[in-house]
UniProtKB/Swiss-Prot annotation:
Residues 1-54, 114-124, 187-209, 285-297 are extracellular. This is Urotensin-2 receptor. Changing residue 146 to R: In a breast cancer sample; somatic mutation. GO terms for molecular function: G protein-coupled receptor activity; urotensin II receptor activity. Residues 377-389 have a biased composition (Pro residues). Most abundant expression in the heart and pancreas. Gene3D superfamilies: Rhodopsin 7-helix transmembrane proteins (1.20.1070.10). It is a multi-pass membrane protein. Glycans are attached at residues 29, 33.
Length: 389
């Protein structure tokens, strides 16, 4: 997936056949170090072992990730589509992961055969798919975090939103991701140089560096700062609610918050090393041996696919949390099997019940189902002593 210029003699990016041609590092025709790279040097035992290992690992990730994300899509659409708000975002996350994992067969084929079989269209589509799904994932996570924030601190605002606004937000995340991906889809092309073929962008090194820096800002830095700010304010709100006089039992929404944060942290853990590796080669030519550079490239590539492979497990926990919460609401108070009162659904309610202190003490429940139960009726006046029968 990556786009790091690297010494062609060590790891020629996107090379299909033939030997590499020496070029100045960082020059306009610098090769691209990526998951679409294929070593064109004569095969040795070490190369065969590395190719077999990376091919096996990526294939296993692809199988597990595709099955897991497909399962997530089926379960989410069947179980939560009609009742929970989160299903729109979980479906979008699973779809982005699924599309990203479907590129693995093309990578493995390039590694094993040491040839690029997919032509100019393959260069544009596969590179574009990488960046499209990456941005769609992080933008969706940002929207999820923003909605969790609003559900906790601004519950009265969320109930006034139209019913289908989440679908519009999901569509907007994909359109924005496509807009950021279009430059690389239009600029990437298949170039033949003697006996080898390379996928190279049509722009020069400065434009290439500027574009990669922009992608880092839009996929890691910008969303990271925004999500960090939202969760910092949520943490402060939780601390204040714990100090309140009337403490409330922890609701399932708090667990949903932790799961969303876990998905975000997993994304950063898998993609931050990848992007640091890309930018390092753009702004500083690290004196790495070819073998070391190849290992780093393999590891960062596997990390990005590992994210899409591991996400379905968190998605399953998130959807299960919502299913349990919805079942608890249907049972109503006092039927939680000894686990304490469970918040029940009031059909004609419009607002979420708060603790009476502030909106920040409200429980972070899904906004479409966390409707506020009507106020408790006034306590009747105490009756006088009854006359003896």
């Amino acid at each position: 997936m990556a786009l790091t210029p690297e010494s062609p003699s060590s790891f020629p990016g996107l090379a299909a056949t033939g030997s590499s041609v020496p070029e100045p590092p960082g020059g306009p025709n610098a090769t691209l170090n990526s998951s679409w790279a294929s070593p064109t040097e004569p095969s040795s035992l070490e190369d065969l072992v590395a190719t077999g290992t990376i091919g096996t690992l990526l294939s296993a990730m692809g199988v597990v990730g595709v099955v897991g994300n497909a399962y997530t899509l089926v379960v989410t659409c069947r179980s939560l589509r009609a009742v929970a708000s989160m299903y729109v975002y979980v479906v979008n996350l699973a779809l982005a992961d699924l599309l990203y994992l479907l590129s693995i067969p093309f990578i493995v084929a390039t590694y094993v055969t040491k040839e690029w079989h997919f032509g100019d269209v393959g260069c544009r589509v596969l590179f574009g798919l990488d960046f499209l799904t990456m941005h769609a994932s992080i933008f969706t996570l940002t929207v999820m975090s923003s909605e969790r924030y609003a559900a906790v601190l601004r519950p009265l605002d969320t109930v006034q939103r139209p019913k289908g606004y989440r679908k519009l937000l999901a569509l907007g995340t994909w359109l924005l991701a496509l807009l950021l991906t279009l430059p690389v889809m239009l600029a990437m092309r298949l170039v033949r140089r003697g006996p080898k073929s390379l996928c190279l962008p049509a722009w020069g090194p400065r434009a290439h560096r500027a574009y990669l820096t922009l992608l880092f800002a839009t996929s890691i830095a910008g969303p990271g700062l925004l999500i960090g700010l939202l969760y910092a304010r949520l943490a402060r709100a939780y601390r204040r609610s714990q100090r309140a006089s009337f403490k409330r039992a922890r609701r399932p929404g708090a667990r949903a918050l932790r799961l969303v944060l876990g998905i975000v942290l997993l994304f950063w853990a898998c993609f931050l090393p990848f992007w640091l590796w890309q930018l390092l080669a753009q702004y500083h030519q690290a004196p790495l041996a070819p073998r070391t550079a190849r290992i780093v490239n393999y590891l960062t590539t596997c990390l990005t696919y590992g994210n899409s492979c591991a996400n379905p497990f968190l998605y399953t926990l998130l959807t299960r949390n919502y299913r349990d919460h919805l079942r608890g609401r249907v049972r109503g108070p006092g039927s939680g099997g000894g686990r304490g009162p469970v918040p029940s659904l009031q059909p004609r309610a419009r607002f979420q019940r708060c603790s009476g202190r502030s909106l920040s003490s409200c429980s972070p429940q899904p906004t479409d189902s966390l409707v506020l139960a009507p106020a408790a009726p006034a306590r009747p006046a105490p009756e006088g002593p009854r006359a003896p029968a």
